[in-house]
Amino acid sequence: ETMLDRIASGDLESSVDDPRSAEDKRFESHIEQGKPYKELRMEVGKQTLKYAQEEL
């Protein structure tokens, strides 16, 4: 019996399978939805840093 046969039968877990459960994925998507303005905040931070450097 080859390793691929064992993986196919569910006897052996593939090391490249995603170990996260469905609950983990739901939690991660909920966290991502909680940061809707991340890109905007990053852009504002870049502008603030730019202005601060210009004042030096």
Curated annotation (Swiss-Prot):
Per its record, how is this protein called by name? Genome polyprotein
> Site described as Cleavage, positions?
2-3
- Show which residues constitute the signal peptide: none
Where are the residues of the annotated region Disordered? Answer: 1-30
* Domain of life, per lineage: Viruses
Q: Which family does it belong to?
A: Belongs to the picornaviridae polyprotein family.
What are the Basic and acidic residues biased-composition ranges? 17-30
One cellular component term (GO) for this entry is: host cell membrane
Alphabetically list the UniProt keywords.
Answer: Capsid protein, Host endosome, Host-virus interaction, Ion channel, Ion transport, T=pseudo3 icosahedral capsid protein, Transport, Viral attachment to host cell, Viral ion channel, Virion, Virus entry into host cell
Q: Which organism is it from?
A: Simian hepatitis A virus genotype VI (isolate JM55)
UniProt key word Transport: yes
Q: Which GO terms describe its biological process?
A: monoatomic ion transmembrane transport; symbiont entry into host cell; virion attachment to host cell
Q: Where is this site: Important for VP1 folding and capsid assembly?
A: 6
